[in-house]
Amino acid sequence: MFREKTEWSQLYWFNTDRKDLPRIMLIGDSIVVGHAPVLAEILANKASVAFFATSRIVGDPAYTRELMTAMADMPVDLIEFNNGLHGFHYDTEFYRNNLQMTLEHLQTSFRCPIRWRNSTPISTPDEPEKLHPERNLIVTERNLAAAEVMKKARVPEDDMYRLMLSHPEWRSMDGYHYNDEGKKVQAEFLAEILLKALAEK
């Protein structure tokens, strides 16, 4: 495996004492790290939130090991899954094939509904109004590949790329992340979708 200069993973469980509430597991990267606490606050007394976030791309053996560890301790009622903003040295075919294998692993390991959340736009550093010409192209290619995988597997998709695309005022200057308003918008978007999904479960 090719590695990024810094690899990282985070696991966080909110409201572990609330056994009476359904639990949502967010799987993603630093975008999840940004909006998960806001989502947990919005959903307080309605659902508990947990997240596993990592810099690893699907297909990295460490990704699956760490994901299974993250999911081992507590049952979850709904999974919101994303991967795609890391591992840019791997092509779209690698991403597609390993995303499909990871999805199949989640489906066989956890008997709960799974939703897919696509990846958010990447802008040019210090120019939030401009999409990054190379990296955002990779994001759109991966989002298309992921959409095909999810459609075939009948996994619903939540389009956060479109939500964030026309709002440079929500972007941080690093090109990847979002300011507090952007995180709030993302959390509100997911809260509505995920509560509805739980109600239909």
Tell what function each PLM region has.
Residues 2-101:
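Conserved SGNH/GDSL esterase-like catalytic core that processes O-acyl groups on lipids
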